[in-house]
Structure formats: C-alpha cells, structure tokens
C-alpha cells in the first residue's frame, strides 16, 4: 500500500520533469525487448542493452546540439522562430547553455549503477537524472580544460569562446549543503569540497530561500554555514584572502546579499544599491506590498480551511510570507502541496489578470515583478524574486569589481547551480535554469559525489 501510494504521488503532473520522463520512455523499449532474454548469457545481454542505451543517449545528444544551434539562429534573427525537433517532442524544454555529452555520461553512470545489467528494473527517473547531472559536469569541465590548454595563439571570437569556463557555482541550502533544517558543521564532508572550489579560484554562492535582512542577518547565515565560515577563520586555512572573499550568500531567493569579509571574519551585508539588477530597482514598493498582503490573506484562508489554526504560524516579512508548523506539529504533505499550488494559482491571477481589480492602482501591471511560491518540505513560502534573479545578480555583482576583469562577464554557460527542487511547480530551484546550468541532487551526499566528480574532472 505504501509503495503504491508513493508511486502514484510521484507521478502527479506538477512533480514530473518532462525531459527526464521522455528519455526514460525511450530507454523502456530496449529494456522490454532485450533485457529479459533468459536464454542468453547475462554478460551478452548486458552488453547488448548497454549498446542500445548508448545509441539512444547519442541520439538525444545530437538533438540537444541541434536545439542549441537553432536557439542561436533565433537569437540572431528572432523572426525565424525555428523550433527544434527536441522541443517539438518535449514542449516544456528549457534552454541549454552547453552541449551535453550524454553518451559518455551514461557509460560512466552505467559503470557505477549497473543499469545495463538489470533484468527486472528498467532505467529509472533517478538513473536519467544522474546521467544528466554527470553530462552537465563533463560539459563544464571540458570547457574548463580546453581553456587552460588554449591560452596562446587565439584571437577574436575564437579567443572569447576559449576563455569561457566555469566561474561561478551556486548552491541551495537545505537538502543540498546540509540536511533539511540542519546546518553545516566543521565535520561536514561538503565543507572541504567548498574550500577546494574556492582554492581553484571559483566563486561559490549559497542562494537560499532563508531571508534575513541587514547586517543583523549575517549571524543567522553564520548559523547555517558555521562549519565553512569557521574553517575560513581558522589558522590552518590555506586560502588566500581574495579566495575567501569569493564566498557569497544570496538570501530570500534574490533579496539580500552577503559576502565573506576577511577583516570582519564573517559575512558582510551588501547594500541593495550595489547589486540590485536594474529591473529590480524599478519594482514598485506599493506593488510588492500588495502582493504580500494578498498572499498573507490567502494563507490565512488556507490555514482556516485545513483547520490548522492551532498547529501553524503565518510569518510575514518585507519580501516574503509563509506558513510554518508550530513546535511539535507538522503539516501533512498533501496539505503542503495543496497550499503551494493554491498560492501559485493566486499569484498567477494577480500577476496576469488586471481586469479582476476595481482599482487600477491595485491592478498595477504587476507582471514585471517576479514572485515564486514553493514547498520547503515542512512549510510553504511565497517570495518576491526568484533564484533566476538571485544567480543573475551574483553574476553581475561580481563583475562590478574592476580587479576581476579577467573573469568577466560571467555567462550562463559559465555558471552552475546545484539544488534539490526542480519540479515545475512549487520548487524554487527550477527558476535557476533560466540563469545557469543546473544539477539536480536529492541529498547532501549526492552533492558531495557530484563535487568530487567536478573537482576530479577539472584536475584530471
């Protein structure tokens, strides 16, 4: 009963990823036709399945290349509006910022996960997710190594292309760097990997939903990242000052920026004027307050509807509003899903349907303001802004410093976001796909594994 419940729940449309499901469907055919040949040698069957799976990933790899090519043509001439075959097959597909060596990634993951050797369990959602993750890491590190090997003898456009490499890595907090509701401690395996990334000259950012404004908020983020910041402050830390100060924290999706400061031995709050994107600076405070007030009232309605008055608390901040369980209580998973979907629908209404409002100043034409609603696992939040803006803000802020012209500009193909929430609705990492390459993990353990691959590929 439990197993069936989980399967049916996981197949809810808003929790699917169409690209992964489509690839999984392609792999189902060779599995059904060839994986259960009881009259053949097991090794031969495995090799046959591997060859067929490899061919599928090679074909998908070619479709990705074609999609990138047509996207580039469309950017040069928007009137063309050419649609790739892959987008026809998977309409919800986003934009690829790098090619994906899916076939090679499959071989590596097949060696680890023995996908081709399975006779009764077909290639799964998680198998495909991990293959896509590995392919993205391979693509980014291939660019990195090509850059290092082609410093001389290149000019013009080719030089610009060769100078592209991974420069910025951002992370979600809960479930990505540390377990849900926990924090980084000095013994965390993630800490040494983050320190290694900083030592390689990469910028490391934490883009989290947790929002604590002003310098007083630095203490809250220190509590979350204690193990890492304590290491940076320790006598045995070998990082140079500029490498330490390549650590940034973006709070409340895209609302509060902090940067490690070596003199303060901690995080320094960065004033909005130094990093807000132009479109964000133009957002009307009245519009933001209207959105927050409307969603606050909607959460009160939902809380009353589910009889959660005694077991939950609604919190309203400057740029976010959420509902959290009281100590010793919890909100059922189905209730969390209902609330986040209801909030998303409410947002869609007030962001697009100005005719529903009697007062034109309330209608606001608020479609220029970005807002996201997400399920945090035990709570539901609605934030002004989103992680696409958070990542883009980091890309632009870093390049305000004239001393780092050698790494600027930082493009989307030179940025990587690692997170656990990539469902199309109710997940706040999903929007990061608009501003960076992404890796979809399910636990801090997977984060450690993917960072080990990343570091090995860079140094290998």
Curated annotation (Swiss-Prot):
Keywords: ATP-binding, Hydrolase, Magnesium, Metal-binding, Nucleotide metabolism, Nucleotide-binding
Enzyme class: hydrolase
InterPro entries: HAD-like_sf, ISN1
Single Gene Ontology MF annotation: ATP binding
BP terms from Gene Ontology: inosine salvage; nicotinamide riboside biosynthetic process; nicotinic acid riboside biosynthetic process; nucleotide metabolic process
Function of the protein: IMP-specific 5'-nucleotidase involved in IMP (inositol monophosphate) degradation.
Subunit composition and interactions: Homotetramer.
Name of this protein: IMP-specific 5'-nucleotidase 1
Protein's organism: Candida albicans (strain SC5314 / ATCC MYA-2876) (Yeast)
Gene giving rise to this polypeptide: ISN1
